[in-house]
């Protein structure tokens, strides 16, 4: 009995050459719908699926391969005498190759289509064939990825068959794909349900690339892109430089998010996932120069994020020092020419502002899921005798936008749209306060990611010349800090929202 391949693909790249190869090895081709037509038009002798099933395609193509004569041929165990006798008694031909790729649900779910249109891209027959073939991988070669045509052809050419190891790997790839595919469909159908956190968490990501290493050189790593969301970090373009490292991905994410907190032109300079210079200005150049001048030491080897176009003048300043990555929504052509003189400088063009509404992190044996910290303040409540001026209030909100991105315990001191001092990652609140104030000469406001447990932060800030403070409030000793502020004649406002970052 001749071997037989069932081929039904949406993405037809490479399938003609693969089908021709199988025919050259005396394999019969069975196919469906558009794939049948495509192969036939290109001169191949192809058996249409309804010749096998003696049943026409129906329901606008929803039912094509869902038939016992197809699935028995896939699932029969070749060295099981009872199975093979059953096939023989019912004149069912075995299927030895299943080549299927799916309707493009991953792509279509992100397009501006009606709900019902997206539903039509949920593939049923394809996954059913793939799963059946993958279960019986000892006897059936299953291909769900066009990139695997080559290895299968090479093995058949060299050995006359596909190795057990390869068949097992191809089967594993099927179930890997199916879990992502089903997860994407589940998330799509449950997206508007009131239950924010379903009983089972289905995440659907596809590998963007392997990374040279992880956080450290002895750790392996890869980066995966969401199949459901076109966010900032899976749609950017690399205009210059090497591929991003693991640490680059994490740092760029924070630099881009921080810069996009602001309506005004903004720049965020960042090292080791921590802002070292943040400023707003009338344009990207002014914002960059302000951020740079605050700490020209720490910015060296850093990541720079902008929320506006980068011009030549700004580029000329940046190439004066060593930087790892520049991220911006747009670049002037002459700015790009300047930046490209640094061949290893990674220059990224971003097409999307931050979009994610959930944040996930793994712990040993579990995953934590929470809302992104996208809410800055609940309500501005002045709690001191003195009220902040309009200019101070602008700086207070500026400082709170920055402190969101600093590891807790975190303090930012600022003036005139410049983060002059940033202190973070400490186990008490007074140490980051002292760090920020030491660096932040001339600062007039102080922002804290969480409440003051004692009055010492307010005392230290007031003695250093701070005129206004912004913090969430909520300590049982809030009054102690309020009294200190009133004593020194400075203002303090509560926001109601804490911004811990771990």
Swiss-Prot record:
Q: Which ranges carry the MGS-like domain?
A: 1-144
Example of a GO biological process term = 'de novo' IMP biosynthetic process
Entry keyword annotation includes Lipid metabolism: no
Q: Which reaction does it catalyse?
A: (6R)-10-formyltetrahydrofolate + 5-amino-1-(5-phospho-beta-D-ribosyl)imidazole-4-carboxamide = 5-formamido-1-(5-phospho-D-ribosyl)imidazole-4-carboxamide + (6S)-5,6,7,8-tetrahydrofolate; IMP + H2O = 5-formamido-1-(5-phospho-D-ribosyl)imidazole-4-carboxamide
Q: What is its EC number?
A: 2.1.2.3, 3.5.4.10
- Please list the GO terms describing molecular function: IMP cyclohydrolase activity; phosphoribosylaminoimidazolecarboxamide formyltransferase activity
Might you report a single GO cellular component term? cytosol
Hey, which pathway is this one from?
Purine metabolism; IMP biosynthesis via de novo pathway; 5-formamido-1-(5-phospho-D-ribosyl)imidazole-4-carboxamide from 5-amino-1-(5-phospho-D-ribosyl)imidazole-4-carboxamide (10-formyl THF route): step 1/1; Purine metabolism; IMP biosynthesis via de novo pathway; IMP from 5-formamido-1-(5-phospho-D-ribosyl)imidazole-4-carboxamide: step 1/1
Q: Which SUPFAM superfamilies match?
A: Cytidine deaminase-like (SSF53927), Methylglyoxal synthase-like (SSF52335)
What keywords is this UniProt entry annotated with? Hydrolase, Multifunctional enzyme, Purine biosynthesis, Transferase
The yes or no answer to whether the keyword Hydrolase is present is yes
| Stated family | Belongs to the PurH family.
Q: In the UniProt entry, what is the domain comment? A: The IMP cyclohydrolase activity resides in the N-terminal region.
Name of the protein in its database record: Bifunctional purine biosynthesis protein PurH
Q: Which organism is it from?
A: Clostridium beijerinckii (strain ATCC 51743 / NCIMB 8052) (Clostridium acetobutylicum)
